């Protein structure tokens, strides 16, 4: 069992991504087409995490031309360049699968979580 943990520790790359379910994020990832390599972004709400050790993934949902699009990203994948948190969401669930049933503006509506910054006087 210790051998598995050693291999997982070596392969963990993107530990710096700090975001939660309900946050609106932009994931910038590499697409390799033959000899060409380009960056593409996907922006949406994080609706779930699947915690499976090194196979940890997160699911992002967005509405594109009135159609819901979901994409699963592995957290420790080398194709992910960066994850930008655009907005912090305030939710009371670990999985936001109920967002799939919402229509129109309600499909992307989540309360914003306010962060308090300490200021020195």
Curated annotation (Swiss-Prot):
Cellular component, GO annotation: cytosolic large ribosomal subunit
Gene3D superfamilies: 2.30.30.790
Superkingdom in the source lineage: Bacteria
Keyword Ribosomal protein on entry: yes
GO biological process: translation
PROSITE patterns assigned to the protein according to its UniProt record, in alphabetical order: RIBOSOMAL_L19 (PS01015)
Single annotated GO MF: structural constituent of ribosome
A Pfam cross-reference name: Ribosomal_L19
Signal peptide: none
Nucleotidyltransferase as UniProt keyword: no
InterPro entries per UniProt: Ribosomal_bL19 (IPR001857), Ribosomal_bL19_CS (IPR018257), Ribosomal_bL19_sf (IPR038657), Translation_prot_SH3-like_sf (IPR008991)
Keywords, ordered alphabetically: Ribonucleoprotein, Ribosomal protein
Function (record text): This protein is located at the 30S-50S ribosomal subunit interface and may play a role in the structure and function of the aminoacyl-tRNA binding site.
Family under the similarity heading: Belongs to the bacterial ribosomal protein bL19 family.
Protein name as it appears in the record: Large ribosomal subunit protein bL19
Organism of origin: Borreliella burgdorferi (strain ATCC 35210 / DSM 4680 / CIP 102532 / B31) (Borrelia burgdorferi)
Taxonomic path: Bacteria, Pseudomonadati, Spirochaetota, Spirochaetia, Spirochaetales
